[in-house]
């Protein structure tokens, strides 16, 4: 069930390819799907993220009823890919997401959510 691939390395390689397709780096929308998405702007890749998230849910629901469980992995791969396009557009890397997950490691999800709510309240009171 655990992948034998170094996840961080695979994400870093994919991120480098995606970043090379940014308009500022000469990504050609006629030759690259990623460059085309980026050229169309946030609405295009954000729409894809929404579509892929829905497909993850549908694949999981299908798996619950005897469907092909591997479709979950395929759809999550599509979701991660399009999310990485968004990260690149906004100037972030997968490493920053991993760092945030590591920061949260060992913290209860309930505690983390309560902390974020408290921080939001403090920010709105400023």
From Swiss-Prot:
It catalyses: 1-(5-phospho-beta-D-ribosyl)-ATP + H2O = 1-(5-phospho-beta-D-ribosyl)-5'-AMP + diphosphate + H(+). InterPro entries: HisE, PRib-ATP_PPHydrolase-like. GO terms for biological process: L-histidine biosynthetic process. One of its GO terms (molecular function) is phosphoribosyl-ATP diphosphatase activity. Its EC number is 3.6.1.31. It is an enzyme of class 3 (hydrolase). Keywords: Amino-acid biosynthesis, ATP-binding, Cytoplasm, Histidine biosynthesis, Hydrolase, Nucleotide-binding. Pathway: Amino-acid biosynthesis; L-histidine biosynthesis; L-histidine from 5-phospho-alpha-D-ribose 1-diphosphate: step 2/9. Signal peptide: none annotated. GO terms for cellular component: cytoplasm. It is found in: Cytoplasm. Belongs to the PRA-PH family. HAMAP family: HisE. This is Phosphoribosyl-ATP pyrophosphatase. It comes from Variovorax paradoxus (strain S110).
